[in-house]
Amino acid sequence: MPLLDSFTVDHTIMKAPAVRVAKTMKTPHGDEITVFDLRFCVPNKEVMPERGIHTLEHLFAGFMRNHLNGNGVEIIDISPMGCRTGFYMSLIGTPDEQRVADAWKAAMADVLKVTDQRKIPELNEYQCGTYHMHSLEEAQEIAKGIIDRGVRINHNEELALPKEKLTELHI
């Protein structure tokens, strides 16, 4: 099985909250695609609660688009990581990490302004696969934590696992 890019970085030294360019690529037509690792939690030390991350998924995608789309950037998708320590964001364009960090903080401020669980987009059985598994309170606790802690930038060259370590791990 091929080694995925996300498994070539050392999760034991990864900072959070932090933005990292996980991957860049070009489409056959030359469009730049960037995938960002938006790390909310320190890997193997913190985890977002399932109801909170689910609610955040519904809110975060729209709020990030409000703050980041434009000037050559268009978000394709924002999806939670299975490990519940962050989200992956795929987009057209190549915004720098600070622009993404600023949009992320603004999106978290928007999450804190939501006053009622009924205001969560697509919170119904027709548009959500587990519509009863939500918590606005948990999502707002996550958002407050991001704002309080601030958002750093993780650099791949600082996190790269040495080839010897990858060999030792039988990868």
UniProtKB/Swiss-Prot annotation:
Pfam families, per the entry: LuxS
A GO MF term: S-ribosylhomocysteine lyase activity
Catalytic function, reaction form: S-(5-deoxy-D-ribos-5-yl)-L-homocysteine = (S)-4,5-dihydroxypentane-2,3-dione + L-homocysteine
Entry EC no(s): 4.4.1.21
Enzyme type, top EC level: lyase
Similarity remark: Belongs to the LuxS family.
Example GO biological process: quorum sensing
Keyword match Iron: yes
Alphabetized UniProt keyword annotations: Autoinducer synthesis, Iron, Lyase, Metal-binding, Quorum sensing
Cofactor(s) demanded: Fe cation
UniProt-annotated binding residues for Fe cation: H54, H58, C128
Record-linked HAMAP family: LuxS (MF_00091)
Cofactor note: Binds 1 Fe cation per subunit.
Keyword rRNA processing: no
Name of the molecule in the record: S-ribosylhomocysteine lyase
Subunit structure: Homodimer.
Role, per record: Involved in the synthesis of autoinducer 2 (AI-2) which is secreted by bacteria and is used to communicate both the cell density and the metabolic potential of the environment. The regulation of gene expression in response to changes in cell density is called quorum sensing. Catalyzes the transformation of S-ribosylhomocysteine (RHC) to homocysteine (HC) and 4,5-dihydroxy-2,3-pentadione (DPD).
